[in-house]
Amino acid sequence: MSEQEEVQLPKLGKAPQVRVNGKNWKETKTPFRTSSLSVPLKHRSWERRQKERENLRMIKAKEKEMKDEKEAEHAEKVRRIKERRMAKEEKERLEKMTAILSAKKLARRKRKEKRNKLLRERN
């Protein structure tokens, strides 16, 4: 072959890009074009989006309020249960104390009666 002959390659519209990661079988992504969107998605006005965002904020605020209310009710229920248990424990403690005190009182009376009986028998 002579040096003057040039090899002509077919002209392609665009040279294919070689992927760095080697995943050449995957489809190459194209930039997002809004002109290809459907009409309802393309013509969403700023005011409409703002209104939707505001509605979403209101819904979330209402959900949070309901959740907080439910949590407060639960906390109140737990507090009442704890108070009831504490009152019951206090009542049981007082009953034990009165039982112990009355037992001591009974013992004192028995000793006193025993003394009186002994004194009566002597006389």
Curated annotation (Swiss-Prot):
Classification via Pfam families: Cgr1 (PF03879)
Coiled-coil features, chain-numbered ranges: 47-105
Name of the protein in question: rRNA-processing protein CGR1
Organism: Yarrowia lipolytica (strain CLIB 122 / E 150) (Yeast)
GO cellular component, one term: nucleolus
Domain of life (superkingdom): Eukaryota
GO biological process annotation, one example: rRNA processing
Protein family per UniProt: Belongs to the CGR1 family.
Coarse class of the protein's main subcellular location: nucleus
UniProt keyword Coiled coil, yes or no: yes
Record's keyword terms, sorted: Coiled coil, Nucleus, Ribosome biogenesis, rRNA processing
Its job: Involved in nucleolar integrity and required for processing of the pre-rRNA for the 60S ribosome subunit.
Localization per record: Nucleus, Nucleolus
